[in-house]
Design a protein with these regions (language model features):
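Active-site neighborhoods and metal-handling regions in enzymes and metal-associated proteins
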Residues: 1-579
Length: 579
């Protein structure tokens, strides 16, 4: 079936089951940003492959809501499907909830699979339908019924990380989580976020492409942890280690029934953005519930000394591979045919030469020419093109190593560039350095500093429609949720920057139909001086890959910026030259 046929089949089921509006989010059962093949339901029904977006269907309308990273991509992928693009945050564009409220008839029914909707979003939908005296049915996955050849859940095995990589035992992590539970007044903590479960157990898996995560849930009490997982993923040594910490193993889906049997005298801690609506609604009525951010988010964001040492080593390895790749690209462009996909394949070959390399840490972005204006463009056999011999090649890639994950963007210059390309490249470098050299007091948030990265672009009347940076997980999610750099305030994401945090600095400029530039380094937050004003913090760049000097206009740089660039390249040379 093509996309219009799939939508027609969905509408037939909506009519049969009595749904007036049906919503299809991106998430899996764990509110993951990136999902395994089994959970790519929104992609199946719309054809849009981006990592963020929500589809809504009525009897005669279909819409997809996504953010600024994906406007160009969605516009192209939705063409001919009958699905209308709604650009989130743009003037005059209704929110998903506003659209649903207007589309529902009085007394109508909104449907969705409650396992792929977070508690907080479910509450917002309850408010939306209340205005029409409508009801919600969250018990059916209608698209799953249409998708007859849907991939099965992953059955890939888990692997364990020793303390030489994690720097902390499961016993210690559980003790810290239980202490946080006490502070919250809770004696039960229900966790669905895959990276939180993996962090606590020091286990990793391969259930989501590029992300070493295990499909699992956890319920933690003061004396036990129940791990809900396909037991076949665990070997005997893992089971024995879990048992030492009184972690019992239960079938993956059994949590939905087990939650119904919680003691109503208990107090349950849940994260409204990281636990699904269906699971939440299975908590017995009358049970006290505390809704707050999972304590593990801050715990895993602050890297310990062992993790920091390992992460820096991973970046040194990655720098060797990236620098070899840069040399290969610059010396072979125009001599042999290099396409977006073949360039990405060459980089992975070079990364595989590094000890401890596992796999790419996310789908590589290798975008030549006008493709680079699509913020998260990922080449496919259908879109793959030869690299332009006169223009820019934007790359955003990463490697997953036993010592940690990397995330790096470099834009390479080939042949003759236009003046605007050079100006944009130089401006992005200024944006990157302006943020990277900030010194700030403890308690400062990413919101406070984001303007530093945007100011050089804003002075030219240019903006980039995405966040400037995100914190990075230790061989888990490449995007972690504790904080980030962005100018659009999100009420729930205002955690301060703290020593031990690893965060990206990735400004960009994107010119539709022409080119795109992004320069990204990872930054480690370090402690600086402490005095009567408080504890000062600063950033240490831990990405050690050359910036392409062929695209820079030196006259645009201040003396200080030139000195910063030279100092950065001196550090890069010291690390990479021996290899």
């Amino acid at each position: 079936m093509n996309i219009p046929e799939r939508i027609s089949a969905l509408r037939a089921l909506m009519e049969e089951r009595g749904y007036d509006v049906y919503m299809v989010p991106t998430d899996d059962f764990h509110q993951s940003e990136y999902v395994g093949d089994h959970f790519k339901v929104r992609e199946y029904i719309t054809g849009f492959t981006g990592s963020a977006g929500t589809a809504v269907f009525t009897k005669d309308e279909a819409g997809l809501w996504t953010d600024g990273r994906y406007f160009l991509q969605a516009d192209q992928q939705l063409a001919g499907t009958g699905v209308k693009l709604y650009k989130m945050g743009e003037p005059g564009v209704p929110t998903v909830e506003e659209f649903i409220a207007s589309a529902l008839p009085e007394g109508g029914t909104l449907g969705f699979d409650g396992r792929v909707v977070a508690i907080e979003e479910g509450a917002a939908l309850e408010e939306a339908v209340a205005s029409k005296d409508a009801k919600i049915n969250y018990s059916e996955d209608l698209v799953g019924e249409v998708w007859t050849d849907r991939p099965a859940l992953s059955e890939k095995p888990a692997f364990a990380l020793g303390e030489e990589y994690t720097g902390e035992s499961t016993e210690s992590k559980l003790a810290r989580v239980r202490e946080a539970m006490k502070k919250a007044g809770a004696d039960v903590h229900v966790i669905a976020a895959l990276d939180d479960v993996c962090w606590i157990t020091n286990l990793r898996g391969d259930d989501v492409d590029f992300f070493p995560l295990l499909l699992s849930y956890a319920v933690i009490t003061m004396d036990e942890m129940k791990l809900y997982i396909d037991e076949r993923k665990l070997n005997d040594d893992m089971k024995a280690d879990l048992a030492k910490n009184n972690i019992t193993i239960h079938p993956y889906n059994a949590i939905y029934e087990d939650i119904k049997n919680l003691d109503t005298a208990s107090t349950v801690l849940v994260d409204p953005n990281r636990l699904n609506y269906a699971l939440f609604n299975n908590i017995p009525g009358g049970t006290k519930v505390v809704q707050q951010v999972n304590p593990t988010i801050a715990m895993k964001a602050k890297k310990n000394d062992v993790e920091i040492r390992n992460i820096i080593n991973a970046h040194k390895k990655d720098a060797v591979a990236m620098t070899k790749w840069m040399y290969w690209l610059k010396t072979n462009i125009g001599k042999i045919e290099i396409t977006e996909l073949s360039a990405a394949a060459k980089l992975e070959t070079l990364r595989k030469e590094q000890e401890g390399y596992l796999w790419q840490s996310f789908e590589p972005i290798c975008a030549s020419g006008e493709h680079a204006a699509i913020v998260h463009y990922e080449p496919t056999p259908e879109t793959d093109v030869p690299l332009t011999q006169n223009g820019l090649f934007l790359t955003d890639t990463g490697g997953g190593y036993l010592e940690g994950s990397t995330d790096i963007s470099r834009t390479f210059a080939f042949g003759e560039l236009t003046q605007q390309m050079k100006e944009d490249f130089t401006t992005v470098l200024q944006c990157n350095f302006n943020l990277a050299h900030a010194v700030f007091l403890e308690g400062t948030t990413g919101y406070n500093l984001d303007v530093l990265a945007r100011m050089p672009a804003w002075r030219r009347g240019i903006n980039f429609n995405h966040g400037t940076g995100h914190d990075v997980g230790y061989l888990m999610n490449i995007h972690e949720a504790s904080c980030g750099f962005r100018c659009a305030i999100r009420e729930k994401e205002q955690a301060p920057l703290m020593a031990g945090l690893v965060i990206t600095d990735e400004p960009g400029i994107y010119i539709e139909g022409s080119h795109g530039v992004r320069t990204e380094n990872e930054l480690l937050v370090r402690k600086g001086p402490k005095n009567e004003y408080g504890q000062f913090l600063y950033f240490e760049p831990i990405t050690y890959v050359p910036i392409d000097l062929d695209a820079i206009i030196p006259e645009m740089l201040t003396d200080q910026e030139r000195e910063q660039l030279n100092e950065y390249h001196k550090k890069v040379y010291e690390i990479v030259a021996p290899h």
